[in-house]
């Protein structure tokens, strides 16, 4: 065949292919047009976290036996446990316990392996500060229970559950 005819056929095939790709993109775009938005207006709306959400660690000072299991299982040796050996009763007495949330990776190993369940994960995830030294929580700060976002009437909570199609 003539070279001009083959070039014209290639041009026609490329035009049809381009139109098909544009049509596919248009169909995908239009299918998303009738969906609800996924974004939330953050300070005024918050998602309800899942049951197993790994937020800030809560610490109960009275339950801790200073066994240091949390330090041994932590991949970055993060919890700082200060204790004193009471020689008369041959037990450790906990003096200080602190975690630096600027370094913590929230893996949950300390909570999982704690033999006395003195550590637990909370639903609190707003830990941002202007000074990184404020992220070093001692046993008093770790012992505070977070305010539940469900109880806060100024914030609209949004349940984050996947839709079940029937």
Swiss-Prot record:
Main subcellular location: plastid
GO MF term list: 4 iron, 4 sulfur cluster binding; iron ion binding; NADH dehydrogenase (ubiquinone) activity; quinone binding
Keywords associated with the record: 4Fe-4S, Chloroplast, Iron, Iron-sulfur, Membrane, Metal-binding, NAD, NADP, Plastid, Plastoquinone, Quinone, Repeat, Thylakoid, Translocase
Catalysis performed (reactions): a plastoquinone + NADH + (n+1) H(+)(in) = a plastoquinol + NAD(+) + n H(+)(out); a plastoquinone + NADPH + (n+1) H(+)(in) = a plastoquinol + NADP(+) + n H(+)(out)
Domain 4Fe-4S ferredoxin-type, chain residue ranges per copy: 55-84, 95-124
Membrane topology: Peripheral membrane protein
Cofactor details (free text): Binds 2 [4Fe-4S] clusters per subunit.
GO annotations of cellular component type: chloroplast thylakoid membrane
Protein location: Plastid, Chloroplast thylakoid membrane
InterPro entries: 4Fe4S_Fe-S-bd, 4Fe4S_Fe_S_CS, NADH_quinone_OxRdtase_chainI, NDHI
Function statement: NDH shuttles electrons from NAD(P)H:plastoquinone, via FMN and iron-sulfur (Fe-S) centers, to quinones in the photosynthetic chain and possibly in a chloroplast respiratory chain. The immediate electron acceptor for the enzyme in this species is believed to be plastoquinone. Couples the redox reaction to proton translocation, and thus conserves the redox energy in a proton gradient.
Protein name, as recorded: NAD(P)H-quinone oxidoreductase subunit I, chloroplastic
Organism: Hulsea algida
Name of the encoding gene: ndhI
């Amino acid at each position: 065949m003539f070279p001009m005819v083959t070039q014209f056929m290639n041009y026609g095939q490329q035009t049809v292919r381009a139109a098909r790709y544009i049509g596919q993109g248009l169909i995908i775009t239009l299918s998303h047009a009738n969906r609800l938005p996924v974004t939330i207006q953050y300070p005024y709306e918050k998602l309800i976290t899942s049951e197993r959400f790994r937020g800030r660690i809560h610490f109960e000072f009275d339950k801790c036996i200073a066994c240091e299991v949390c330090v041994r299982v932590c991949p970055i040796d993060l919890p700082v446990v200060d204790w004193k050996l009471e020689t008369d009763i041959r037990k450790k007495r906990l003096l200080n316990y602190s975690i630096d949330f600027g370094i913590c990776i929230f893996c949950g190993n300390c909570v999982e392996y704690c033999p006395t369940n003195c550590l637990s994960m909370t639903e609190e995830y707003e830990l941002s500060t202007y000074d990184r030294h404020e992220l070093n929580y001692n046993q008093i700060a770790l012992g505070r229970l977070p305010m539940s976002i469900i109880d806060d009437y100024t914030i609209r909570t949004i349940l984050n559950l996947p839709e079940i199609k029937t």
